[in-house]
């Protein structure tokens, strides 16, 4: 049974990592340090730039986050790939929210642009995912554009984020 709401807390997202939110067949989010959001503030089946679905999530920033101590010593910055991964995580989460089953795998991205950075002095990172297409046949796949914002300013954009759900990943 899919727990389908408009918003989710950190505890809900952690439960997703244990396959407790969307059922045993639903795609789990990463757990621990690789979970790149603290809450999902909005999910809709319509809306967004293409009126085919929208997700908005947030990550609270503080200087004690794990990546600031190692990326880089004396020049702490959140790795851009973590923001990209967060967008892929949200595409997979949305597919589970729609009732899709399987293990999520990032399948690609058309283009990524970085125009800013997340420093330990920031307060909040926001992610916005605008769905272009959802395929729900033998293959379950989402295609979306995304934005990463720091304290309200867009700093990364990604086009054609692709995530698929796979019931068997052995041949992946």
Swiss-Prot record:
UniProt cross-references to SUPFAM superfamilies, sorted A to Z: Thioesterase/thiol ester dehydrase-isomerase
Record pathway: Lipid metabolism; fatty acid biosynthesis
Reaction(s) the record says it catalyses: a (3R)-hydroxyacyl-[ACP] = a (2E)-enoyl-[ACP] + H2O; (3R)-hydroxydecanoyl-[ACP] = (2E)-decenoyl-[ACP] + H2O; (2E)-decenoyl-[ACP] = (3Z)-decenoyl-[ACP]
EC number: 4.2.1.59, 5.3.3.14
CDD domains xref list: FabA (cd01287)
A Pfam family per the record: FabA
Active-site residues from the entry: 71
Molecular function via GO: (3R)-hydroxyacyl-[acyl-carrier-protein] dehydratase activity; trans-2-decenoyl-acyl-carrier-protein isomerase activity
Gene Ontology CC terms: cytoplasm
Stretches assigned to coiled coil: none
GO biological process: unsaturated fatty acid biosynthetic process
Keywords: Cytoplasm, Fatty acid biosynthesis, Fatty acid metabolism, Isomerase, Lipid biosynthesis, Lipid metabolism, Lyase
Protein localization: Cytoplasm
Keyword Repeat annotated: no
Superkingdom field: Bacteria
InterPro entries associated with the record: FabA, FabA_FabZ, HotDog_dom_sf
Summary of subunit composition and partner proteins: Homodimer.
Functional summary from the UniProt entry: Necessary for the introduction of cis unsaturation into fatty acids. Catalyzes the dehydration of (3R)-3-hydroxydecanoyl-ACP to E-(2)-decenoyl-ACP and then its isomerization to Z-(3)-decenoyl-ACP. Can catalyze the dehydratase reaction for beta-hydroxyacyl-ACPs with saturated chain lengths up to 16:0, being most active on intermediate chain length.
Family assignment from sequence similarity: Belongs to the thioester dehydratase family. FabA subfamily.
Family matches, as PANTHER family: 3-HYDROXYACYL-[ACYL-CARRIER-PROTEIN] DEHYDRATASE, 3-HYDROXYDECANOYL-[ACYL-CARRIER-PROTEIN] DEHYDRATASE
Protein name in UniProt: 3-hydroxydecanoyl-[acyl-carrier-protein] dehydratase
Lineage: Bacteria, Pseudomonadati, Pseudomonadota, Gammaproteobacteria, Enterobacterales
